[in-house]
Each structure stands twice: as structure tokens, then as C-alpha cells.
Amino acid sequence: MAAPANASSKKDHVIPVLLNECSIDSPSFRASMYYLGNQIKAFNEWSHDFLCCCNKFIESIMAIEPIVASMSLNAMPSNVASGFFDPDYATTALLHGQDLFRSSYMVQLQQAKNLRKFIVAPLDLFRDSKVKPLLQLNDRFKAEQAKYDAEVLRYSSLGHSKDLSQMRDEAKSLYEARKSYFTVALQYVVRVTSFRSSIDFIVIESICKFSIETFRLTDRLHESNRHINDQLIRLLSYETKLKESYPSLKRIVSNVFDRIEKEILKRVQPPTNLDAYRFDPQQICQTNATKRQGWLLRNISSSKADNKAIWRKYWFFVDNGYVGYLINDANGGVFESEKIGVLLCKFSVLPSNHRKFCFQIKTKSVSYILQAETHMEMLEWGSVINNAREHCINSGISANRILSPTLPSFSAKATSIINPQVNGRSNSTGKIGKNYRPRRTYSGRLLCGPNNYEVSTIMRSPTISTVPPPKYLSNSINGAKFLNPLAPWTLVNAPLITNLTHETITSLLDQEAFFHGNSPCALLANFWGSVNYGHVLERQNVYIEDLSNPSYKRLAREIHIEKLPSELKLRNAEFRGIFGESEASTVLFVCRVCSKREDQIRMPGRMYCTMKGIYIYYNINGLVLIEHFPISSILNVKQFASTKCDYFYMNIQNIGTVRFRLYLDSSKALTDRLNVLLCNYIADKPNSSIQLLSCIKRLNDDVKRFERGGDDNALKSYGVQPSQEDLLIRRGRSSRALTNLINKNESNDSFMEDLRDFKIAMLPKETVQVVRSHHLDDIVFDRVYNVSTKALFHIVFGDRSTVLSGAYNLHGVDDVEFLPWGKDPKTNLSRRYINYKVYNYDQEGQCQSYHYEDCQIMDVRNDYHLYIMTWLHHSWTLPYRDYFKIVTKTSISHLRREKSRLLISVGLEWIVKPFAISKVIEAECRKLAIKYIKTEVNFLEKATRRARNQPLIAIINQYGRVGDYNESMVYRRKIPFNCELKNLSIIDIIRNNWWLFLQGLAIDLLKLPWAVFHIFLRYLFSHSFLVIIFACSVILNLSLMFCFGAKYWDERQNNKFVGQVFDEFKNIETSARYVYMKDVDDLLVGLPTYLHPNVTYPSECLQSFALKSSPQKSHWLRKRNYIAEKRKKILENLASLNYYEYIIHEDAVYQYIQQELLGCDKAREFDLYPPSMQRYCDSCTQDWRNRTLFFGKDTLATRLLTLETVENADYAA
């Protein structure tokens, strides 16, 4: 379909059938009409033969047995079955009906009347009311199509010599023919959609009612057919629900068709302006499109004269830098030409006396002489080709060669002839008859037609030979004994389905949609193309990173088609045909579900379950809906069964509960298999898709052994086709959700044991003891949390957890980069490196940056049992920082259900141990490590409190899986941290820990050789040593008094006083909060944010103050707003000051706040306070004076500025 001038590339993928080539007047549409007419005729012939057999059966009672046998074995033709019958419900009912025909009538021959009542009469009425009118409409459509093509050719043959008014009359004549053709085509579309639904209704209703009546009238039915009764009841319930929702669905479809018809007729109407029909070679088309498609007339006899040339209609396209065309085959197929790069093409306008609007696309080897319908259309083709050429040059696309069509971009590949035809009918036996002549094979061409739809389905999986015919499927299903409860063989050839959604239909009415010229809409090709035609995406090479420790994302992307059984190969080919290669993942099992939509609409569909998540495809009456639920968003699943259907519920994060009904499959089996996927997702060492298939097979075999009493010899392989009798396995009510599944060991012990066999760990039954050797000597933290070990592990060490990044930010780190996890080749343990950068100011005031690298090692990772993590950290604030690393070991062990134990120990790893000062450095490192631990504990208290009532999957989604990211994660500070780091000197450390210094000195001295130690002792107790010590002390005191004097000792005393005040800050945090919230300021402007306890009636006082108006109050409010803005800037400046800078600015800050308090006293002079507020203001003023010094230290100011946060205030500080 031709793209408009302003079509955006965003909508190119919305209608992906045949390069968005889905108009009513297109090759796919015409091929669909041809294919549809054959199917209608085949169905008419089959129904006629079927009714004749039924009448013979009724009339010939004595010959009842052979007639019943021939009727039950009369297989549906493949072209009819794949075209009309639903592959899940209608064909299942049909097969069950065939079995019951044979068994039930052999018991009671009196059921002939019921046969006439429930089957013959409805089908006969259906043929008269539905099939015959549709055949007549088909003939009418062919006549209108021939008339329309003839009119187009006649109109195109007009030359330039014609009068313009006559050309306008001819255009109107062409418009009438086109209008009649499009009207009939749209009527055909509407009738087709109702026709297919009517067939499903009549088949399901007739056969189900007849079968149920059969069970009621006889007690001597064959014992092997009793299980069919339950499923037929479910099918009838499904048909009833579907029939109830059909009026609402039909109303929606009719409204869409009416809107599309009006829009089509409006857009294809020819212009009335005569200038539109005038040839002007100087005119330029303004368009930025690089893609276009539509009908063009091609001169296929360029050697002849213009008046004798032969012109044919071709569907040309420009896409992805290539030019090509499609053409219809006489048998209803669509073939594609070889594609030519636009860089090799040259566009030129051809003036012609016999043809108007002609142009040429020429290369070195081929030349296309083409004719457009209008002058503007010709100019648009030229502009699109030039734009596509410029796009290839600018983007570096090498679209400059001729491509062979062996790798198609939008059609199926014809590698062989599937289902050979004999005398116009399919040879179901698979043998080639005498009169069979092989059809001509088209080498180098692409086939998309009724003879090739099987290739379209299986081309994505090279290991699938072909799809068995329906008869073979029927025999294989009846012959097998045991059944895989989900995803039985599709009874017809699997369709290749496109993404036609409600958004597609909506976009058809958009101004930027692909309506243009003679390409009006995209409807029937999408609808019918969803069965036998379709958009086959090119296979994309998915890059999988080479990691020694594969993550869940990598395992989910791995595809092992060759290792799958034949049934799953077919399901995977079908899945990639629907969802494309972008959602590439191995389909593990498929389930048929039915979902409820708006206006009581029931949407039947298939649920494809993969490691990535659940994909659901719904298709009814031409409307398609696609849903996707990632595996990470599924919190839990549950199911219960009833007589008419099974109910299956999924709790989806941020969405709620999604409800489904299962009529053919078992919700119990579906729940068990999804629980396997969910457990594998949260496992620390997830399994691959092949391992999960083995686990699912084990679960299925256990259920079969339980039902049969443990007959192991009767088990079949996973790929063997099962029978229908195992479809209804145990349907007991199940309340297992994911949280119960991983925590409750008492229920379903065999299920748990199977999960353990396949390395899907579950909750331990006993307390896990941590070996003392796993920790360092100094254990500084030991606490029990009311969450599971896995939940606590992800809260602390998850990829999105902020525990570690917050600890770095607390100590002034600006940039932190967490590298991906990898394997240590020496220890074979998982580890990751952490790079970060800190800033420091030298003595000249220049900012210097320092880079450090820490390491995190995962020592033990045992699912639900024990986790041990080691953190090697550089302390950049301590001297000799390159001589050691701080080691912090964290262990999380299982205590009991929903309880875990957290142990943290700290130590030092010396690279080079210095003399005499190792003890004091160890003490300072312990203090620093305890600060980190306090930050972690404050965060864990709040995080575990929130996670107590959350499911495990929600916790993993919030904090991230451990080691599941493949690229570095970088965290940057949101608030600039431009302060100078407080680096401790070795003298300060020794002065604060002098006793530990003496111990370290003594220990290191004892390690010295005895001769050196003897000389040191003699000098230590000599007279010269004491004189030297006395002289040094005198010089030190004199230098201190000379350099600092009394001011030094005053500052030191102030420092001690301020330190005491800061230690009491936590006890008076409430007072500091309302001081920061500026109660006095807000009170004066009438918007207080904090209510003081001394206020008796705050609402009345505030109301009386707000209602009082005076000039003095207005002046005061303006003045206070100005002061508040100044005060805010000072607070922001205080946030960036450190302790020493505060000492310098302390007097200025105190003076400023005192001026503010004097301003508050002036408020009383202006009589702005009601009497009832006097006590409140006095208390506020007193508290303000007492808390003045709280704005001194940087960490405290930062904390005051972030007090408005609800739960992360302490952590953000």
C-alpha cells in the first residue's frame, strides 16, 4: 500500500502483512479471494456429501453399520479444515463426534431421528441460508473485479489528446466502477467473518447437542467414550458463552467496517480540479518518505511501438533500500521479483503521446517502463526513490546490489511442493497417483498461496519435515494411550498469524495511515492472511554474551530447536510466526484459554509459556489481541475446577488478578508447570529450557503413575502423541500460590522432591548453622529479621539495592561504578569490582580526584540456606591507605520459616604492615566499618518491614536479581558534594588511641632482634633521653601558644561543646524538624506546616489569624517572604560547609538568626498575633533560640534539608 507523504516510520510495523501490502485491491487480497472461493466450493461439496450420507443412514436402517463407519471415517479436507474450523474447539468437537457416531449408533439404531433433528436439518438449513448466498456473492465479486480491471485499463489507455473535461468524465466512470467493486468487496468481508463464526457455532452446537442427547437416551454406550461426555459439556458451555458475546462483537466489527467503507470512498474519490489531470514535468513532490508500495502499469513489450505495447498491473514496492514487485499467479499465489538496490536505480520521467504519467526505473541490466494513475503519484514514486537513495548513503546502508529472493523479507520461501494435488483434490494418503503431473517449480521466486502455507509455517524450524495431515493426526491421537495434558497436536496445519490488533483497525482511520490512491485499506488480507498468508520476519542473529556464569536473561534467550520434540518444534515455529524473532524464546508448553473482555466479549486464544514470560494470542471474528506478561511480574497463580470449565487465576504485579477459563486443558497441570517456571526464575542457579522440559516431563509422568497406580512400563517418551483420555487429569481444587509453594514443605512432597532433583532448591526444614571459620574474629553485628534468607539476600545485595551505593555516598563518593559479576579463575568464585572516585582539596585550594577499586566476592550462595559475601574496601580517609584493605564478611542464614539471621564481621587485610601503628589503624578501621554497618542496618530495618507482606518475586523485582546485569552500573550524587574530606593524620589517630599504640609498639618491639631491642632499652632509660623529651615538650608548648594563643583553646572548647550538642540531636529530632519547617515564618504567612502541642485550638486560631487583614500585616508578609528566601539560601550554603568552616562563620550565622528573632518580636508591636496565639509564639521563639547551633555541621545541615522525605531521611543523610 502506498505510504502518504507524512507517514511516520513508527506505523510501518503496525500492519506487517506483506510489507504492509494489505489493501482490498492488492495481490494478497486477490489471492485470498481466489483461495476463499475454492474453500467455499469445497465446503459446499463436502457438506452435500455429508448430508447425503446422513439421509442414506436414516433411510437404510438395515445398512446402518457400514454407513456409520463411512461417516465417522470421512475426514475433513485439509483446505476446508484449515480455512474455517477452529483448530482447538471446533475440530476437537468434530473428532469426538466422529468417535461417537461409530460407537453410539452401534448400540442404539433408534438415534436416526435424533441425527435428522440435530445434524441434518441444521446443516441443510445452513447450506440454504449461508453457503449458497455466499457463493452467489463470490460470483458477483468476480464479475465486479473483471469489470473494474477492464475499466482501469481503458482509462489508462487515454492519451494526452483527450479533452480535459472528457478525462474528468472518464475518471468519474472509473470511480463508479471502483466504488461498486469496493462495496462488493467489503460486503464480502463482512459475510466471510460471520460465515466462519456461523460454521463454528453450527458444528459445535449440532454435534454437542446430539452427543448429549445420545448419553441421555442410552446406558449402553461404549465404555471408552465416557470421558468424552465431560469435555463435550465443556465445549457446549464454551459455545454458549461465545454465542452470548457474539452480538456485542458483531456490533463492534460492523461499526469498524462502516467507518472504513466511508473513509475508503471518501479518500479514493477523484479530484474535481482540472489541474490535477495536467502533466507538468517541472512540478516537485514534497515528501520525506523512504517507503512506498502500490499498483503500477508495466510495459512488458518495450520493443513494440507505443500504440501496440502490452501493459500489465504489478504491485511495486520500495522498502529498506530495495525496489521490487509482486504479481499474482493464475493459481492464486503471490510471487516476488528479485530486489534491486536503489543505489543502482535511476528514475526518469518519460513523455509519451499515447500514455500519460509514464516514468522509467533503469539499471545496467534491467529497465522498468511504468505508468502511474495520477501525476502526483508519479512524482511521489520519484521522490521516494531519491529519498531512499539519500537515506542509504547517509546511513551507510550497502543497498547497492541485486538480491536473490532466497532470503525473503516478507513472504514464505518455496523450497518444495507440499501436498501434491491429484485431479483437483488433496491426496490424503501421501501417495502420488498415476495421472499426477508435477507442477512447475519457480526457481528464484517466492510463493505465497494455498499450496504453500505449510512451508510458511515450518520454514523457521529447519528440523521440522512437515505437518502431518489431519487423518494421520486423528489416527495418532486415537492410537496413543497417554497424553500430555497441554498442547496436543493441532488438528490442522498450524497457521502463521500476523499482528492484527485493535490498534491496527484504529490506525486505518488515521490521517497518516496507508490510505492513498488506489490502495484504500488493510482488512481482509490481514484477516484471511492470519490463516494461510503472513508476514515472515527475517531471522535475526541474537547475540548471547559469553559469560562463565550464565544469567537468567541469557538462558531465556537460548533456543535449542533441534533438541525439542516434534510437537514443541511446531509450537515454537507458530510462536515465532506470531510474535516475531524479537521475542525469541523457547516455548515450553502451550495451553488453550478463554479470556473475558469488555461488553461480555469472550476471547479464545492460546497461551505460549516461555522462560521470558507468558504470551497470549486471541483471535475471533477477524479481531486479534496479543498480551504479554513477563515472568517477573507474575506474583502467584492458582486454579480450581468445575463441571463446565476450569478456572485459572494469575496475580500480576501492578495489574491485579487476570482470570481465564480452560475448556480443553487442565488448570491443575497448567498451575504446576507455571510454578516450575516461577521457582526457576527466583532460583540462584536457574536451569535452561531443556532442563525445565525434563522437570515438566517428570511432573507429568508422576501424575500419570498416580492415576494408573504406578505403571512405569507404560510410559512413553515426551514427543509421543498422547490420547484424549488423559486430557482431564485430576481437577481437584488447588490453593498453591508461589509463596506457599516455596515455603510450605508439608503439601505436595513429591512435587518438591522433583524440584530438588532438577536443582530448583526449596526451603530447608532445619536451621542452617554458620561455621565459625566462615567469619572473621571480630563479629560486630548479629540480628534476626522476619523475612526469608533469599528475600534478605536480594534486599542487601540485589543489583538495584542501594545499600552499598548509599554507604559510598555517605562518605563523600561522587561516582561509583559497579562492574559486572564474573568468575575468579583462581578461586572459581563469583566476584565483581567496584570503581569509585573521590575529590579532595590540597593546601593550595586545588581540587584533586583520587580513584580507588574495591572488590566484592560471593563465597557461598546456597538457595534458601546460606549466603556469604566478602567486601574488600579501601579507606581513603586514613593514613597508609595503600597498606591495607577493610574486610567485611556478611552471612545470611536460614533460621526458620520466614526468619533469617544476619551476621557481619570486620577485619583488616594487610598488604604491608607498618611498624608500631597497626593496632591504632585497626581500631580506626573498625570504627569506619561500624559506620557503614549502621547505614546498612537503618536501611534494612525499613526495607524488611516493607517486605514482610510482599511475595518473593515482588522483592526480587524491586531490588533486582544478583548478578543479572551485563553492563556496568554507575551511580552519581544528585547533590554536589564540594566539601573537603576530613583526612585523619597519624598523630590524631595515635593521640586518640595512645594505649593501643603502646600495645602495638610493644608487640612490634618484641619481634625485633634481641641486640637491637637491648640498645633501644638502654637509650630509653638514659639521662639524655629524658632531657630530649623535656626539651621537645617545652618547644611544643611555646610554638602552640605563639601560633594559636588563647583563640586556639577557645575554638577547641567550642568544638567540644558543639560535639555534645550534636550527640543530643537524635533525642530532640522533633524540635529540630519544626524548627527547620519554619513554623514562625509559615505562621506569619498563614500556612503553618507543624502544630505545636501548646496550641489548644489550632484550627480556630489559624482561621482567625488568616481572616485578619490590615496594611501592617500585608507589609509584614512581604518582608517575611523576602527574609524566608534569604534564609533558604543560607541554609543551602550551610549544607556545603564542613566543621572548620562553620567555626569561622559561626558568629555571622548566629547574628543573622538573632536578627530574625528580633523581627519576630516586632511582630507583636504591630499587633499581628491574636491573644490565643501568644503562648504558641513564645514557645516557638524559645525553642528557636535553643536550637541555633544545629545548623553548624555539614551532615546535620544535609539531614535538615532532607527531613521532608518520608522513609529514607536517615539513609539519605
From Swiss-Prot:
Keywords: Cytoplasm, Cytoskeleton, Membrane, Nucleus, Transmembrane, Transmembrane helix
Cellular component annotations (GO), alphabetically ordered: cortical endoplasmic reticulum; endoplasmic reticulum; endoplasmic reticulum-plasma membrane contact site; lateral plasma membrane; nuclear membrane; plasma membrane; spindle pole body
Transmembrane parts of this sequence: 996-1016, 1025-1045
CDD domains hit by this protein: BAR_SIP3_fungi, PH_SIP3
Record-linked InterPro entries: AH/BAR_dom_sf, BAR_dom, PH-like_dom_sf, PH_domain, Sip3/Lam1_BAR, Sip3_PH, VASt
GO BP annotations, alphabetical order: endoplasmic reticulum-plasma membrane tethering
Subcellular location: Cytoplasm; Nucleus membrane; Cytoplasm, Cytoskeleton, Microtubule organizing center, Spindle pole body
Domain PH: 289-390
GO molecular-function terms, A-Z: lipid binding
Domain of life where this protein originates: Eukaryota
Membrane topology according to the record: Multi-pass membrane protein
Residues in VASt domain copies: 776-945
UniProt entry tagged with the keyword Transcription: no
Coiled-coil residues: none
Protein name, as recorded: Uncharacterized PH domain-containing protein C19A8.02
Native organism: Schizosaccharomyces pombe (strain 972 / ATCC 24843)
